Amino acid sequence: MAAIVFGVVVSAAAQKGEGYQFTDKKVVKTVPITNQYRSGTCWCFSTLSFLEEEVLAAGGEQMTLSQMWVVRHAYFDKAIKYVRLHGNLNFAVGGAAHDVTEMIKKYGIVPLEVYSGYNYGTEMPEFGEIDNVLKGYVDAIIRNGNGRLTTAWIDGLNAILDTYFGVRPEKFTYKGKEYTPKSFAESLPIKMEDYVEITSYTHHPFYSKFILEVPDNWMWDAMYNIPMGEMMAIVDACIEAGHPVAWGTDVSEKGFSRQKAIAVIPEVVEKNTIGSDAEHWGKLSDAEKQAMINNLEGPMKEKTITQEMRQEAYDNYQTTDDHGMVIVGTAVDQAGNPFYKVQNSWGDNGPYKGFYYFSRPFVEYKTMDIMVNKNLIPKDIKKKMGL
């Protein structure tokens, strides 16, 4: 049974105030929750957690890789490209999953204990100053009145990065063995070349690759484009095989509750079906509507997501490159509705100690892109992708 509460269809469980109750169905091996704190580095924290969990899935040992090693090198490469393009590029701390794999290919990787990257008086990332200093520097380089760039500007850039993140080690010892960053990356039981990014939009042909047009794709990386149903089938296949999925999404949707660590896409009933309730709903502010949705303590009817809905949300800026996390499992609520268990990088707090539950409709609707091990893609889909 269901009742209509201010335009949202609510289940009987919600009316009883039972709250959401989740049962995990399949959860992969996970590493500890991390905390990006006051930095826009979700793309790095989430993708490194994803890769660390891929190491576990491959039979390797648990480790924590240096997030700031990746961020430092990404900022360097981004600065070079920004200056080359005379500032016509998004120069900010945001990024995507491929930033991580590409930086590891190019610069290697080191454990966190070797390079923390917090060389500015804090024990957690706080990027307000760093972001502004770096943006001010590259803009000053572009604006210089000399008519040409000096030979010193790249040294100056490296000096800023080394000051904030620390000098990079050429060699280091880890568990009694000496490595370079490149040799340590090669020692991992996973290969960066095995990871591909997938998206699902109709403004480019399916079964082709295209550069996803979002500001944080500063690398202009091309992704595989496939139908939504096949993208979801890949997510399910990875989890079933015991592997995580790196997930680029948008958590600005009204059905996302940070406090409750739950995200849904509530079905709002058409106004002409609910009389005075619709009138009342229409008069509520966005904050009041959000409060109503957040206070629905239990399963609710959700929208049926279509390919067209995904595209419209992307075209209208309703879905943007907002946040990166890791899908680590499947679950159901007490009504049997399918959810995904998701690992966030906002610290080990909240009702599920840093994990969140996102409904299947939310993932269908709000997925910008995923990164997966290409060897886990179902054969029929993989063939159509040309892999």
What do the predicted segments below correspond to?
Residues M1-G17:
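Bacterial Sec-dependent N-terminal signal peptides
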